[in-house]
């Protein structure tokens, strides 16, 4: 490809609205342009990277026996109503109404569509298991699109769905897809860590996310410093063995705390440690009120709360609701003499002796509060976020944190969708059974951004060879010099004939501009044709290491091939 005809509008300045490196570099390297918030046009460089990623995905999935299909982007509301997700999915589901007043959704995922297809196509155990996949654009009405391709409203995704007669078959497919994902990300040059995760709006139980480690990651990974344990912080279990300090129980006292309403303010006012304070939160759990208790130095994990109680809807009470239910303002509520609500506590409360809590009275708190004597807990559960330094849940080492970008996730859905949409099969005994399902997603466009987050330097992108838009960037440093253009053109064609993807910079620009753009675009190897062109020599630079060597044109093809092989290892 000759750059003079190639749509790659590079930029010198960092765009003001681009907060993360991948977004900045994709804009500056002429890979994408924004159409609206969270919506982008993919220019030729980006499309070439995406095609290479898609090729890796297809190769690995085809080897597992998965079959590629294409499903519609537009979904009738009736399918989503059957599954119950028309309302449950919330505002992120993009909905529209056609001219006949029929409702549709732009698909964020395809569980409903694929389940209805298999329901109508397969009815015997002899046709199972089955695994199908597609690669297409998805849509989510993100409240706050940001970070370029990391959180957009339209994005490219690979989604796969498997159907099974039993749990053993599903477990086998889950392992097959888990391993395929590991190979896909490794081949794409991504440093990825699989972590235990929450299934969210997709549903099901067992699930793992594949996290690309990066400073800008929106997800926090909790991992052991001495084992392979890793989980999304939302799902990391707390295994602290709490014990009560051996202290004499002091008499409870009511004290004035003025305008101190936060944990920190109360701790400072009373000169106590935050871990001595009982944090009380009024929460609506499936439309019933509960008082949630945590230690002052701990934070409520609403995912854990939802799982612990088997709840579908959880929200914090408003200030008005706290006043109506408890009779006081936020910041002064507590478990002593509270009536009409269930009291649910995190295990950390067991470690508090002579603690502090709100007195359910304006500007007042109790000190020297003790469970059993002063209040009763109805249920204990693991309700808090794990913290760095906590014991690892597997009993090996302590917990450390890292940031990650979710690039893939695998789910065991079970019968969540098949039962609701009636996807059944006849077993060996002729009995109707619901199919067990798995689903498996990869964020293809997000992978592009994740690769850049992990592979860049101060000058631009540093593409891994497997997903680079081209293998080699040939620069004709002075297009007015006939010998340079002649050699550059010869080098360009000889590399192409060797089966390499080559970009030839034949623009009438200064050499400095070409070098800057080459570093910014970040192809694995650069071949500069300059002053020694009349002798047949060119300069080869390895983008990743900065190594520069002079090579005669007659030896260029084997040299380039050897360098690419070294980079791929």
Curated annotation (Swiss-Prot):
It holds the Pfam family HGTP_anticodon. Its EC number is 6.1.1.15. GO terms for biological process: prolyl-tRNA aminoacylation. It is found in: Cytoplasm. GO terms for cellular component: cytosol. Keywords: Aminoacyl-tRNA synthetase, ATP-binding, Cytoplasm, Ligase, Nucleotide-binding, Protein biosynthesis. One of its GO terms (molecular function) is transferase activity. Disulfide bonds: none annotated. It is an enzyme of class 6 (ligase). InterPro entries: aa-tRNA-synt_IIb, aa-tRNA-synth_II, aa-tRNA-synth_II/BPL/LPL, Anticodon-bd, Anticodon-bd_dom_sf, Pro-tRNA-ligase_IIa, Pro-tRNA-synth_IIa_bac-type, Pro-tRNA-Synthase_IIa_type1. Gene3D superfamilies: Anticodon-binding domain (3.40.50.800), Bira Bifunctional Protein, Domain 2 (3.30.930.10). Catalyzes the attachment of proline to tRNA(Pro) in a two-step reaction: proline is first activated by ATP to form Pro-AMP and then transferred to the acceptor end of tRNA(Pro). As ProRS can inadvertently accommodate and process non-cognate amino acids such as alanine and cysteine, to avoid such errors it has two additional distinct editing activities against alanine. One activity is designated as 'pretransfer' editing and involves the tRNA(Pro)-independent hydrolysis of activated Ala-AMP. Consists of three domains: the N-terminal catalytic domain, the editing domain and the C-terminal anticodon-binding domain. Belongs to the class-II aminoacyl-tRNA synthetase family. ProS type 1 subfamily. Homodimer. This is Proline--tRNA ligase. It comes from Halalkalibacterium halodurans (strain ATCC BAA-125 / DSM 18197 / FERM 7344 / JCM 9153 / C-125) (Bacillus halodurans). The gene is proS.
């Amino acid at each position: 490809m000759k750059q003079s005809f190639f749509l790659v509008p590079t930029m010198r300045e960092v765009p003001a609205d681009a907060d993360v490196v991948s977004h900045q570099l994709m804009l500056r390297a002429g890979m994408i342009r924004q159409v609206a918030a969270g919506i982008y046009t993919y220019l030729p460089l980006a499309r070439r990277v995406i095609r290479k990623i898609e090729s890796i995905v297809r190769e690995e999935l085809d080897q597992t026996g998965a079959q590629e299909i294409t499903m519609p982007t537009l979904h009738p509301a009736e399918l989503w109503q059957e599954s119950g997700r028309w309302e449950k999915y919330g505002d992120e589901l993009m909905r529209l109404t056609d001219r006949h007043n029929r409702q549709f959704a732009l698909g964020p995922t395809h569980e409903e569509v694929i389940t209805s297809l298999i329901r109508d196509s397969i009815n015997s155990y002899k046709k199972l298991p089955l695994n199908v996949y597609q690669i297409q654009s998805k849509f989510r009405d993100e409240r706050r699109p940001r970070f370029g391709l990391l959180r957009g409203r339209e994005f490219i995704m690979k989604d796969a769905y498997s159907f099974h007669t039993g749990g053993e078959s599903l477990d086998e497919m889950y392992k097959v897809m888990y391993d395929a994902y590991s190979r896909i990300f490794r081949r794409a040059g991504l440093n990825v860590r699989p972590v235990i995760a929450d299934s969210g709006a997709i549903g099901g139980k067992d699930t793992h996310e594949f996290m690309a480690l990066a400073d800008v990651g929106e997800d926090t990974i909790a991992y052991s410093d001495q084992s392979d344990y890793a989980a999304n912080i939302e799902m990391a279990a707390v295994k602290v063995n709490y014990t009560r300090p051996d202290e004499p129980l002091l008499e409870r006292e009511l004290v004035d705390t003025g305008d101190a309403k936060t944990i920190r303010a109360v701790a400072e006012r009373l000169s106590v440690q935050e871990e001595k304070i009982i944090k009380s939160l009024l929460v609506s759990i499936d439309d019933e009120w509960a008082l949630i208790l945590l230690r002052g130095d701990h934070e409520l994990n609403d995912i854990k709360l939802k799982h612990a109680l088997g709840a579908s809807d959880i929200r914090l009470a408003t200030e008005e609701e706290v006043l109506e239910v408890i009779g006081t303002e936020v910041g002064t509520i507590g478990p002593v003499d509270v009536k009409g609500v269930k009291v649910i506590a995190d295990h950390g409360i067991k470690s508090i002796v002579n603690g502090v809590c709100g007195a359910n009275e304006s500007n007042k708190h109790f000190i020297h509060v003790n469970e059993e004597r002063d209040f009763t807990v109805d249920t204990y559960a693991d309700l808090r976020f794990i913290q760095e330094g906590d014991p690892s849940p597997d009993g090996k080492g302590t917990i450390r944190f890292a940031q990650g970008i979710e690039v893939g996730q695998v789910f065991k859905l079970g019968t969540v969708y098949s039962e609701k949409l009636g996807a059944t099969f006849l077993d060996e005994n002729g009995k109707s059974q619901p199919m067990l399902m798995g689903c498996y997603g990869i964020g293809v466009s997000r992978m592009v951004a994740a690769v850049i987050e992990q592979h860049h330097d101060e000058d631009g992108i540093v593409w891994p060879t497997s997903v680079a838009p081209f293998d080699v960037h040939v620069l004709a440093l002075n297009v007015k010099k006939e010998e340079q253009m002649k050699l550059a053109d010869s080098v360009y064609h000889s590399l192409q004939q060797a089966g390499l993807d080559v970009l030839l910079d034949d623009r009438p620009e200064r050499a400095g501009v070409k070098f800057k753009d080459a570093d910014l675009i970040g192809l694995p190897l650069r071949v500069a044709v300059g002053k020694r062109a009349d002798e047949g020599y060119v300069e080869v630079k390895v983008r990743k290491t900065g190594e520069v060597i002079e090579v005669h044109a007659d030896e260029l093809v084997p040299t380039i091939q050897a360098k690419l092989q070294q980079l791929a290892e």
